[in-house]
């Protein structure tokens, strides 16, 4: 029913506001990339209203040039459509795009169409061993995004 959907949605917004945390070093990494004028697109499987809410709650909107959702595309990340749309929006060849994912299904989809990939551990997603195996770079549970900042700053 609509009442249940409203109730469930309100719980999701509370989760993003009170429970969900920004991954360690993510804000520094985004700031570093933005300072270097690197285009950033957030391509999420989450509904756009929830994505925008989460970005605002954590003051991350300012880093992204584009934000797209699978709901807008009409298909999940098991198909490359959202990545192809992101590439089109950014105007960059796939070989120059790096996709960050915590889902092995999404990461493998991006990799199949030629994107570089960074797998990021997420305790809420199963298949971490497969994610690690499929990633060009993998950041484990105890690693932070700070190591990527150092790699980018040294280029």
Regions found by a protein language model. Name each.
Residues 1-5, 23, 27, 61, ...:
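Short, structured helix-loop boundary elements
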Residues 2, 6, 20-23, 45, ...:
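Non-catalytic, surface-exposed connector residues within folded enzymatic/regulatory domains
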Residues 3-13, 65-67:
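Short, basic/glycine-rich phosphate-binding loops at helix/coil junctions
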Residues 10, 14-42, 48, 52:
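Short, acidic loop-to-helix structural element flanking the phosphoryl-transfer center
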Residues 31-34, 47-48, 52-155:
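Asp-based, Mg2+/Mn2+-dependent phosphohydrolase catalytic module
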């Amino acid at each position: 029913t609509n009442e249940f959907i409203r109730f469930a949605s309100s719980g999701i917004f509370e989760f993003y506001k009170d429970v969900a945390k920004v991954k360690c070093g993510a804000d520094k990494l985004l700031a570093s990339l933005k300072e270097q004028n690197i285009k950033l697109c957030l391509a999420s499987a989450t509904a756009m209203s929830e994505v925008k809410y989460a970005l605002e709650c954590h003051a991350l909107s300012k880093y992204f040039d584009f934000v797209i959702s699978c709901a807008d595309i009409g298909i999940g990340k098991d198909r490359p459509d959202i990545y192809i749309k992101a590439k089109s929006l950014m105007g960059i060849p796939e070989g120059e795009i790096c996709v960050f994912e915590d889902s092995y299904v999404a990461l493998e989809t991006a990799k199949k169409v030629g994107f570089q990939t960074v797998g990021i551990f997420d305790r809420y997603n199963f298949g971490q061993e497969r994610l690690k195996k499929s990633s060009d770079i993998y950041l484990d549970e105890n690693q932070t995004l700070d190591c990527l900042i150092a790699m980018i700053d040294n280029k």
